[in-house]
Every structure is written in C-alpha cells, then in structure tokens.
From Swiss-Prot:
Membrane-spanning ranges: 4-24, 37-57, 87-107, 111-131, 134-154, 167-187, 208-228, 242-262, 272-292, 305-325, 330-350, 386-406, 416-436, 462-482
Pfam families named in the record: Proton_antipo_M (PF00361)
Gene Ontology CC terms: chloroplast thylakoid membrane
Matching InterPro entries: NADH_Q_OxRdtase_chain4, NADH_Q_OxRdtase_chainM/4, NADH_UbQ_OxRdtase, ND/Mrp_TM
Family of the protein in this entry: Belongs to the complex I subunit 4 family.
Record GO terms (molecular function): NADH dehydrogenase (ubiquinone) activity; ubiquinone binding
Taxonomic lineage of the native organism: Eukaryota, Viridiplantae, Streptophyta, Embryophyta, Tracheophyta
GO terms for biological process, alphabetical: ATP synthesis coupled electron transport; electron transport coupled proton transport
Protein's UniProt name: NAD(P)H-quinone oxidoreductase chain 4, chloroplastic
EC supergroup of this enzyme: translocase
Length: 500
C-alpha cells in the first residue's frame, strides 16, 4: 500500500477547494474565474507529477494503492489505485477540464455555482477512474451525475430542461442495473462479501450468472458510451448544453462508459465477454454506419457533431469486442483521441455561436472571410475527425481495423465483413464533416448580425483551440506516447481470454 495518499488528494482537492468559491465576493467574477482556473492547473500539475515520479509503466499491476476502512458497519473501504488503463483517462480529464474552465469565461449568470459544479464533476470523474472498489466506483459514478444534471438544466438553450431530464432518466435507469450488478457480484459466493477489484478479478461464477451480471453492467455502460439504441439522450443534450459543458460531456463523460466496459465487463467477467463480443462487434459496426448516415441530415451544428461522436464510439466498441491486443489498444487510443477531437469541435461550435447567434447550418454560409482563424481551426479538426493520416484519429481507427482483422477468435469471412462495414463508415465520415464546413464557411453570407464587424477568435479562444490541437497532432505523429501507458495492462487483460 502506498505510504502517502496521492490519489485521495487528487480526488478530493477539486471539490474541497471548489467549495471555497462561495466565500469569494459576489461581484468578483474575474477573481473567481482565475481561482477556478488555478485549481484546475494545480490539480493537473499534481496529477502529472504523481504519475511521472511514482508510477512504473512496465508494471501491469495496480499502483499507488490506498486502502482505508471507511464505514465500519458495512465493512466498506475507500480503495483507490491506478494502472495503465486508468492513467490516460485521468490525465485527459485534467487537461479537458482545465480548458473547459477557460472556455467557460463568458458565463456570467450564477458563475460561482457554475464553476463549483465543474470542479465537483472533476472530482467525481477522477474518483470513477481511480476506484478499486466496486461500491466506491458506483458512488463516484452517481455523484458525478448531480453536477452534470445541474449544468445541463441551468445553462444552455431553450429546451435545456427537457434535455437534462432526458439525460437523468436514461442515466439513472442505467444506474439501477449497475447497482444490481455491483450488489450481486459483491454478495455472491464467499462467506465474507467483498467488492475489491483484485479479489473479484480472480473469482469465477456459473456461466448463466456471469451472463446476467454482464447484461446488467452492459446496459449501464451502454447508456453512457452510448451504444444504440440507448443513444437518443446524447444529441438532445449536446444540442442544448453550454459549450463548455459539451466539452466535458464529449471529452470525458462518454469515455467513462468505455472505461467501465473494459474495467468491469472485460476484467471481471471474461467468460461472458467471450460470448457477447461478437454481438458487440456487430452493434459497433452498425453504430458507425447508422450515426455517420444520420449526421448529414442534422441541421443543428452541435447535433451533427454529437452524431459524429456516436459514430466514433462504434470503433471503441469494436476494439473492445475484438479480443486482441491491437484492437483493445486501438480502443484505448480512440478514447484519448476522441476526447481531444470531440472537446475541440464543440468548443469551436460554441465560439461560432457566440459570434453569430446561429446554430442551424442552413442559415449560415460565407463565414470563412470574416472569421479566418475559426475557419482554419475547424477545418483542421474536421480533418482529425475524419481520420486524416498524421492526426490521432487515423492511428486509433487503423489499430482497431487491424485488431479485428488479426483477431484469433473469429473466422475469416465475418472479419472481412466487419472490416468492410467499418470501411463504409470511414467513407461516410468525410461526407458529413466536409458538408458541415461547406455549409458554414463557403458560398454567400446568409445571416445578418446586428453589428457586421464582429471579431474573429481572440487570444483565449486561440489558446484553447491550439492546446486541444497539439495533442491530436502529437498522438498522430507519435502514438507510442499514449500506447506505452496501457500496453502492459492490455496484454494482462487479453491473456485472460486465451489462458483462463
């Protein structure tokens, strides 16, 4: 066990310091914004320092473990720890949240509450990724929903209450299945109930019971990921939410579903995962094509980007179902890659709305000349979204593609068919990405703003855009930087399916 509680400090620091926001003067919006930004930067630096100096990349076992008895009556432990699977999402969470707080500077209504909720969400997400106890994982998973619901219902478009209610109904419905699965696994078998990940990973279940547990967890994670047909909350939520909230939703929240699928369904329930993986691959391939063909019909800019997110999540599902080192590494790389790309696209969609007050593509046009910086950034990020070689999306999708082709678990003809469907999805992606650019930036200017002389991206917006773009280019050129974090852990997970 680790002697110094690094992870507890990392989890608790944002919400504890965030609660002090309410002690700052009400009129001091600027002070409060700088305070929130400083908390996020300090947290990111602390996380980076901890991982650089106290984490060994070549060790697939859980590191920095903390194990404190919390509630004696229930024998409930505060168990934290990280491995190669959780280190990437935790760093991604810190990076995206820091930039989202900077993106949220135009928010003036109830700004104190807004920034506190962002920091509370930050704590919940890091807690979910670093939990080593199933009940603690569930509590963090649920705790994180409260600030998300409030951010969606209080700031955003005219239908924000409808979209927030839809979001909470879907996620709360999924959480019921998650709770049943957690309690079922914890209470099964041994005389002493345990919820420790390490103990549960070595426990075996009757196949029928394992399948029941698997389905429960799958429904909960399918809502978050999302997997069709449980995806309908996502376009509505993205269409109405403030763009800094969209950055957190697209960049981190969806990835929690993928993380749960690998951490619980793959690691704890490998026999059931073997049975369900062909179905996951088929659903993933259908999802890529369905979302990519639905996206061009969306006139709302943010809804179009939301459907592109659903399509890209299909690659993660296929990677998880491929049961191969290459495929799972590709899925983890896609989690990180799409975190940056999705957050950047929603940020730029929001900044364009700030200027022209329009979200519908058929009302735009000719924006390239008055807004050249926005045009350049959105063009590059659209290329990243459609997996242009040299950018992170290309490497991730290519690894998933090779992962399914080289998988030893499937026959040749099904593999060729799935690869063909994935290729169709890759062809459909440029259609909605490039048509979005054409409708926004080319042709005649269709809109009238009260003041024709509106400004292009300022220094703050350029800084956020470039900060999101640099990792996309960096991962595209040198993907080993991310893959080296998870490769040992991935080998350990996949070995269960061949030697167990």
């Amino acid at each position: 066990m680790n002697s110094f509680p690094w992870l507890t400090i990392i989890v608790v620091f944002p919400i504890l310091t965030g609660s002090l926001i309410f002690l700052l003067p009400h009129r001091g919006n600027k002070v409060m914004k700088w305070y929130t930004l400083c908390i996020c930067i300090l947290e990111l630096l602390l996380t980076t320092y901890t991982f650089c100096y106290h984490f060994q990349l070549d060790d697939p076992l859980t590191q920095l473990t903390e194990n404190y008895k919390w509630i004696h009556f229930f024998d409930f432990y505060w168990r934290l720890g990280i491995d190669g699977l959780s280190i990437g999402p935790i760093l991604l969470t810190g990076f995206i949240t820091t930039l989202a707080t900077l993106a949220a500077w135009p928010v003036t209504r109830d700004a104190q509450l807004f920034h506190f909720l962002m920091l509370a969400m930050y704590s919940g997400q890091i807690g979910s990724f670093s939990s080593r106890d199933l009940l603690l994982f569930f509590l963090m998973w649920e705790f994180e929903l409260i600030p998300v619901y409030l951010l969606l219902s209080m700031w955003g478009g005219k239908k924000r209450l409808y979209s927030a209610t839809k979001f909470i109904l879907y996620t709360a419905g999924g959480s019921i299945f998650l709770l049943i699965g957690v309690l079922g696994i914890g209470l099964y078998g041994s005389n002493e109930p345990t919820l420790n990940f390490e103990t549960l990973a070595n426990q075996s279940y009757p196949v029928a019971l394992e399948v029941i547990f698997y389905v429960g967890f799958l429904i909960a994670f399918a809502v978050k990921l999302p997997i069709i047909p449980l995806h309908t909350w996502l376009p509505d939520t993205h269409g109405e939410a403030h763009y800094s909230t969209c950055m957190l939703l697209a960049g981190i929240l969806l990835k929690m579903g993928a993380y749960g699928l690998v951490r619980i369904n793959m690691e704890l329930l490998p026999h059931a995962h073997c049975l369900f993986s062909p179905g996951l691959i088929i659903v993933g391939a259908i999802q890529i094509i369905y979302a990519a063909s639905t996206s061009p019909g969306q006139l709302n800019l943010k809804k179009r980007i939301a459907y592109s997110s659903i399509s890209h999540m299909g690659f993660i599902i296929i990677g998880i179902g491929s049961l191969s080192d290459t495929g799972l590494n590709g899925a983890i790389l896609q989690i990180i890659s799409h975190g940056f790309i999705g957050a950047a696209l929603f940020f730029l969609a929001g900044t364009s709305y700030d200027r022209i007050r329009l979200l519908y593509l058929d009302e735009m046009g000719g924006m390239a000349i008055p807004l050249p910086k926005l045009f350049t950034m959105l063009s590059i990020l659209s290329m990243a979204s459609l997996a242009l070689p040299g950018l992170s999306g290309f490497v991730a999708e290519l690894l998933v593609f090779f992962g399914i082709i080289t998988s030893q678990k499937y026959l040749l003809m099904p593999k060729i068919l799935i690869a063909f469907l994935m290729a169709i999805g890759m062809i459909l992606t440029p259609i909605y990405s490039l048509s979005m650019l054409r409708q926004m930036f080319y042709g005649y200017k269709l809109f009238n703003v009260p003041n024709y002389y509106f400004f292009d991206s300022g220094p703050r917006e350029l800084f956020v855009s470039i900060s999101l773009l640099l990792p996309i280019i960096g991962i595209g050129i040198y993907p080993d930087f991310v893959l080296s974090l998870s490769v040992e852990k991935v080998e350990a997970i996949i070995s269960h399916f061949f030697f167990r």
